[in-house]
Amino acid sequence: MKLSKDTIAILKNFASINSGILLSQGKFIMTRAVNGTTYAEANISDEIDFDVALYDLNSFLSILSLVSDDAEISMHTDGNIKIADTRSTVYWPAADKSTIVFPNKPIQFPVASVITEIKAEDLQQLLRVSRGLQIDTIAITNKDGKIVINGYNKVEDSGLTRPKYSLTLTDYDGSNNFNFVINMANMKIQPGNYKVMLWGAGDKVAAKFESSQVSYVIAMEADSTHDF
């Protein structure tokens, strides 16, 4: 099998969520954070030819980048991974899947309580401003008939009362109130346009960011509130 640049970019993103991954035959890949706060899945254009566990995905991708774009990836007779182009061959150790954390099955996200969207340029601004202003927490909330993302530094503002950044997403004509709080450490998502789905039921809250190719389900912080 061969991995395209698009697939490699997705795998690099997944490696930021979990350094290990279990690849299964087909065109669907998924991962989750070791602490369970983030789940990600993608439909890729390439076909995974064999099941294999990788303990250090980043290092595997680094080695892959050192051979030609035409390199063929296959399962060697000893159970390890063979990466070969016309002149060179690299053998990469496969992992025992018991040594990595991976999702057993795709997450079925519940029917959303609120659906909105965030454009690629707005997401890029949010991530850049967050780094520049040391924003470690964001809250997706409704205010004055709008759905808004507010950014905070929770270390200096534990009550999340003084936003350092605010971004209006869209109008909101619902009757429910919500304040979905996300740790920015869990916002490891690829650039792009996303449908944002918010769900709450009692003390359970989650958000799903869905693009045409990649989706992420992110757990909310305990101080999230809603009246759904």
UniProtKB/Swiss-Prot annotation:
Signal peptide: none
InterPro entries linked to this entry: DNA_clamp_sf, DNA_pol_proc_fac, Sliding_clamp_C, Sliding_clamp_T4
Domain of life: Viruses
GO biological process: DNA replication; viral DNA genome replication; viral transcription
Annotated keywords: DNA replication, Viral DNA replication, Viral transcription
Molecular function terms, GO-annotated: DNA polymerase processivity factor activity
Quaternary structure and partners: Homotrimer. Interacts with the viral DNA polymerase; this interaction constitutes the polymerase holoenzyme. Interacts with the sliding-clamp-loader; this interaction allows the sliding-clamp-loader to open the sliding clamp. Interacts with the viral DNA ligase. Part of the replicase complex that includes the DNA polymerase, the polymerase clamp, the clamp loader complex, the single-stranded DNA binding protein, the primase, the helicase and the helicase assembly factor. Interacts with the viral RNA polymerase (RNAP).
Similarity comment: family membership: Belongs to the Tevenvirinae sliding clamp family.
Function (record text): Sliding clamp that encircles the genomic DNA and links the DNA polymerase to the template to control the processivity of DNA synthesis. Responsible for tethering the catalytic subunit of DNA polymerase to DNA during high-speed replication. Interaction with the sliding-clamp-loader opens the sliding clamp so that it can be loaded around the DNA template. During transcription, encircles the DNA and tethers host RNA polymerase (RNAP) to it.
HAMAP family linked to this entry: Sliding_clamp_T4
Protein name: Sliding clamp
Organism placement in taxonomy: Viruses, Duplodnaviria, Heunggongvirae, Uroviricota, Caudoviricetes
